[in-house]
């Protein structure tokens, strides 16, 4: 929640200094960016790269966070605990965005082992946004020029057209 609060504060500050404001986040940053769109309707552009739309799925299914998962389970938390209504506000896949889908871009990797393609598909269906799929994993997505170029073009067109 702290990241979401800070992103919203920064956006408010920026809106006093410019005419258009967007947000771009990857992975957990994508979670923060996505959650801001469930609260605010005045983003001019939103780019989500491999967004963690279901933190519980990452925690309980990704092999890359095995040690964290083991610690959480040892503390007595189960996947069922994430079904609680209080948790829904932290799950983009259980919330609705306030942003027009034409102002949103999702980029995701076919080979992502952190944020599963099926999780991204569920977010895409719920929010009515298309996904730009690339042949990358979670980390290699950031290192490829093509998705960066695609996203930069989207932001330029959406923010400055």
Predicted regions and their residues:
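Hydrolase active-site cap/lid region
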Residues: 35-80, 133
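Gly/Ala-rich beta-loop-alpha elbow adjacent to hydrolase catalytic centers
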Residues: 24-33
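Acidic catalytic loop of the alpha/beta-hydrolase fold
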Residues: 110-115, 138-140
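Active-site nucleophile elbow and catalytic-triad environment of alpha/beta-hydrolase enzymes
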Residues: 77-97
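Alpha/beta-hydrolase active-site loop
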Residues: 1-16
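Catalytic histidine-centered segment of alpha/beta-hydrolase-like enzymes
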Residues: 136-149
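Short alpha-helix in the alpha/beta-hydrolase fold that links the catalytic acid
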Residues: 102, 116-125, 146
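Short beta-strand/loop motif that positions the catalytic acidic residue
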Residues: 99-100, 105-108, 112
């Amino acid at each position: 929640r702290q990241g979401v609060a800070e992103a919203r504060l920064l956006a408010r500050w920026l809106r006093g200094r410019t005419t258009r404001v967007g947000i771009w986040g990857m992975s957990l940053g994508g979670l923060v960016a996505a959650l801001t769109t469930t609260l605010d309707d005045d983003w001019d552009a939103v780019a989500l790269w491999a967004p963690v739309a279901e933190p519980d799925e990452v925690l309980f299914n990704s092999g890359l966070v095995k040690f964290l998962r083991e610690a959480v389970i040892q503390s007595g938390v189960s996947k069922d605990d994430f079904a609680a209504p209080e948790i829904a506000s932290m799950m983009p896949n259980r919330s609705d965005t306030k942003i027009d889908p034409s102002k949103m871009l999702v980029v995701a990797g076919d080979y992502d082992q952190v944020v599963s393609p099926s999780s991204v598909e569920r977010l895409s269906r719920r929010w009515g946004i298309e996904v730009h799929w690339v042949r990358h994993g979670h980390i290699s997505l950031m290192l490829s020029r093509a998705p960066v170029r695609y996203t930069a073009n989207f932001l330029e067109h959406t923010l400055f057209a």
